[in-house]
């Protein structure tokens, strides 16, 4: 009798994706982050669903409804902090996942990579709108500042901003629609994830050598299911330590003050995972220029396949580009730090230097390094 997992129309799909999937025998723990991101998405959808049962998207009651969840709902505090810190864990995994993709040249699987870039934008949009929902000071002013950036678009900017706001300022209409979008987007993200996996399984996974691994494949289960489970345990341990011992460490104290349109906080800043992009935005004095730089700081990922000059796929055996890569990582950490600092000397000039370095390394230095390495190895 044929095994049901190989014949049943539905189970067969799961079998080909997670059980009998041929996987390279040498993929390292850097390949764990895909499954960890799936776990993060599941946690966010579940905790978000329970929060939505008690939350009210009205400017008069939004803040107090979040307080009510934390004080009066059974384990409401846990659900709320799991959701808030779950977003941070999500972005940590995302950044590591993208970083792995850049290091090992996974961007050469163009459909999978572009789907991933779209996913990154979708997750960032979802997180931004979620941050607005508690209706604290930083929620309100963050929403005001970031949506107002669209007014830099020539001709249609002002109209577009008022259309998104549903009025002449961030108000009840804005909060209601942000809640609606924040609720629906994770399900759209789930659909996009399936497409991402569909494209990945067309080509098969990359591996640390960057070489073709068709000659040496092993089944996904039990090898990588067990390996992924170890990653899951480590992630959950870190997640629960963060949630139960340091729930507010990544948040902003200003968000415990109800939104007040008449009182601007001294330093408006987004959550930590947007600070690098916020620093790039602020480092350009011109409004439209800043917005373009902000979008390009993420969109530049889609250009990576075009900027790949090396005859080798991964950075494993390319010391010059490796050096550039780690300088880029350090540069992103500097940008993240600068994004949380006030706009004054010396932070302005550090931010501008780091922003120029970010684009220079990706657009100029890494492609040149690739060509130099080809020359050294006589690969051209």
UniProtKB/Swiss-Prot annotation:
InterPro entries: Cyt_b/b6_C (IPR005798), Cyt_b/b6_C_sf (IPR036150), Cyt_b/b6_N (IPR005797), Cytb/b6-like_sf (IPR027387), Cytochrome_b (IPR030689), Cytochrome_b_C_euk/bac (IPR048260), Cytochrome_b_N_euk/bac (IPR048259), Di-haem_cyt_TM (IPR016174). It comes from the Eukaryota. It is a multi-pass membrane protein. This is Cytochrome b. A ubiquinone binds at residue 201. PANTHER family: CYTOCHROME B (PTHR19271:SF16). Heme 1 (or BL or b562) is low-potential and absorbs at about 562 nm, and heme 2 (or BH or b566) is high-potential and absorbs at about 566 nm. Pfam families: Cytochrom_B_C (PF00032), Cytochrome_B (PF00033). Heme b b566 binds at residues 97, 196. GO terms for biological process: mitochondrial electron transport, ubiquinol to cytochrome c. It is found in: Mitochondrion inner membrane. The chain crosses the membrane at residues 33-53, 77-98, 113-133, 178-198, 226-246, 288-308, 320-340, 347-367. Component of the ubiquinol-cytochrome c reductase complex (complex III or cytochrome b-c1 complex) that is part of the mitochondrial respiratory chain. The b-c1 complex mediates electron transfer from ubiquinol to cytochrome c. Contributes to the generation of a proton gradient across the mitochondrial membrane that is then used for ATP synthesis. It comes from Microtus felteni. Belongs to the cytochrome b family. Its cofactor is heme b. The cytochrome bc1 complex contains 11 subunits: 3 respiratory subunits (MT-CYB, CYC1 and UQCRFS1), 2 core proteins (UQCRC1 and UQCRC2) and 6 low-molecular weight proteins (UQCRH/QCR6, UQCRB/QCR7, UQCRQ/QCR8, UQCR10/QCR9, UQCR11/QCR10 and a cleavage product of UQCRFS1). This cytochrome bc1 complex then forms a dimer. Its main location: mitochondrion. One of its GO terms (molecular function) is metal ion binding. Keywords: Electron transport, Heme, Iron, Membrane, Metal-binding, Mitochondrion, Mitochondrion inner membrane, Respiratory chain, Transmembrane, Transmembrane helix, Transport, Ubiquinone. One of its GO terms (cellular component) is respiratory chain complex III. PROSITE patterns: CYTB_CTER, CYTB_NTER. Heme b b562 binds at residues 83, 182. Coiled coil: none annotated.
